[in-house]
Amino acid sequence: MTFKIHNRPETKTIQTFDIPESQVLTLSSGHQVHLSNPCNIGVVRVELFWASGSYHQEKPYVATMANDLLLSGNEHRTEFEVIEYLDYLGATHRTECGHVGSSVVIRASKKNILSVFKWFIENVHAATYPENEVESAKLVRAASLERQQKTPKYWSSRIALESLYGKDHTLGIHGDPIDYQKVTSENLNLFKKQHFGLEKMMLLVSGDSDDQLLHSFADALLPFPGTPLSIIQEQFTETFPQFEKPLMHPVDGTNQVNLHLAKHIKPKDQQERFGLTLLNLVLGGYF
């Protein structure tokens, strides 16, 4: 079948969404809040954010495990009891740990969000990383990493980062399953004390929020007076010493990250490119 030129789909210019800027407020407790445009949907999303991540760890996986196991229990409650009450309130949560930032995101109905928030604050503050929970997490994560290391996807990503940044660079370094066995409950408690204190976080709030809810959050945080976040100009310049700020390339409708990588990755010679292409075809066809 032959398509005429006038039947080809039209190319459309990519346009950004017209989203209102978030408000930046400071609660009476001293904590900074980034508040998105409120909307009447009956659900509230709250993100507890710390300006600390894998950049600050001294051992592999300490930051990730310290963040993921914040609700693993304490001297008064087990992990099951902590999560059971969240389920009762109909709340969901997830954790994220990046290079220079970590967060816990909670979602709940507006009528329950304050109870959920107080429960989170109480249990995050009291978290002690029980030995049994830490050991279970280490076994599961080490087994998961072993499975990942049997795939070409893992190794292509790892080799690319190690080649781009260097094996000893914070963005290029990778751990192995055996490194999980070196993480202890003491390591996690120390990292939490240094980096995940409630006084060191800020909040990002979206959904069905209002002034009364923010005042209630502030009251819950009064025992932990907020301090300014130490975000990371020094860390950024150390990570990318050749740049004082991110570069933007004037090409419309493109991914700036991909452009940056394409500009700075050393090109391969023809023979090496052919070998990599052949390897990719073989592995891609096999897996």
Regions found by a protein language model. Name each.
Residues F17-I19, D87, F243:
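Residues that act as N-cap/strand-start positions at coil-to-secondary-structure junctions
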